[in-house]
A protein has these predicted regions:
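Mature, well-folded catalytic/scaffold domains that follow N-terminal targeting or propeptide regions
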Residues: 1-382
């Protein structure tokens, strides 16, 4: 993002207030984590984060980070499958953290990402494992596009009803508690072949950006959904994951399938809102473009200065990246966003978070409750 040292320091100072001191480390416990039974015993318990962190730091030092990631996430054994589920928990925060480590080749950050995954829950297992088992029954079935699956999810009122039945965790306590098989049957129809990895990575990125930006209410000011935003923020790392030579083609396929299935589930969990492409294409930026030769420059500079917890800058960065990797496929119908749609989304993002109403994000865009405090949109003056 080309932020200056002074901006980085300013943003760190802005966010340091909620940083927590690490829990004390139990050296004996860290040693015992080498035993698979002991390793499993402490999973999902936040207070053991620091112990898992020290453990994974040691494992990476001894084995190399590539071998550790393959062993603990992609070995296709009980422990690795469980950790992979946890990596997608917490609305994708563990895999986002791991992604930064892989992108910038930082083993210390990778250890943090693995430790985060270890202390998250595995309640998404029925979705991911159930979808794999269902898909395996029809191995020759052609994949549906992600847009097809969003439309299918929207056509199921029972999914919206399940998601709307709780305000706590709409995936766990709504979709998976009440309509798990319906959700599994939908997402199982998305699958990836090894020779499709690049185009499917781009498609996933395109669709995540589309439903994040297009879930608007025409009578309300532009706002992005907080949960949807994580889907596109995470997508940037899949371009990196898919080009790691230490990761097998089979595991690249699996990782990408899980990400696509997670995206459809996330869309349904927020009430499957209408997706309005015209809201993107007709948007009038608050600050006109200054330099057409470098159209992202002003947006990036503004979001770097904007004081938040980093979500805005992650989103702008992911959108600019999405434009680049989707460009070769823009003539394909499953790629909804084209050309300057990405830049429009960049303007929508920075304008919405800078808005004086102080509402940076909404939560659960498909439900009226998400929009109740958002100002009404001013009508254009003729």
């Amino acid at each position: 993002m080309n932020a200056s040292p002074s901006i980085i320091q300013k943003q760190y100072d802005h966010n340091k207030g909620y940083q927590r001191a690490p829990e004390p480390v139990d050296g004996q416990l860290v040693h015992h984590l080498h035993d698979r039974t002991e390793f499993h015993k402490y999973l999902g318990k936040e207070r053991f984060y620091h112990d898992y962190l020290k453990y994974f730091q040691s494992e990476i030092d001894n084995k190399g980070w590539q071998n550790v990631l393959n062993e603990y996430l992609f070995a296709r054994d009980e422990r690795a499958d469980d950790m992979l589920v946890r990596l997608f928990a917490g609305f994708l925060h563990p895999i986002i953290h791991l992604g930064f480590g892989v992108e910038f080749q930082q083993p210390a950050i990778m250890a943090e990402g693995l430790a985060q995954a270890a202390v998250h829950d595995n309640w998404m297992r029925p979705l991911f494992v159930g979808a794999e088992e269902t898909a395996a029954k029809t191995p020759n079935q052609q994949s549906k596009t992600l847009m097809d699956l969003l439309n299918e999810a929207k056509s199921k009122p029972e999914l919206r009803e399940a998601a709307g039945s709780t305000s706590s965790n709409r995936i766990r306590d709504g979709l998976l508690a009440k309509q798990a098989q319906t959700m599994v049957d939908i997402v199982a129809r998305y699958h990836v072949k090894p020779d499709e990895i690049d185009v499917k990575t781009a498609e996933m990125t395109n669709i995540c950006a589309f439903f994040t930006g297009a879930a608007q209410r025409p009578e309300k000011d532009i706002k992005m959904d907080f949960y949807y935003m994580h889907c596109i923020n995470c997508s940037i790392f899949f371009d990196k994951f898919m080009h790691q030579d230490w990761l097998s083609p089979e595991n690249k396929v699996r990782l990408l399938e899980w990400k696509g299935r997670n995206a459809v589930t996330m869309y349904a969990s927020r009430g499957s809102p209408d997706l309005l492409l015209d809201e993107i294409r007709n948007y009038k930026p608050k600050i006109p473009l200054k330099d057409p030769s470098d159209p992202w420059k002003d947006i990036i500079e503004r979001v770097c200065r904007f004081e938040d917890d980093g979500h805005g800058s992650k989103l702008v960065r992911a959108l600019a990246h999405g434009q680049r990797i989707c460009k070769p496929y823009e003539d394909r119908p499953e790629f909804i966003l084209k050309h300057d749609d990405w830049l429009q989304l960049g303007h929508m993002t920075i304008d919405s978070v800078e808005a004086p109403d102080g509402i940076h994000w909404i939560r659960s865009a498909g439900f009226d409750s998400a929009w109740k405090d958002v100002p009404d949109r001013k009508k254009a003056q003729l």
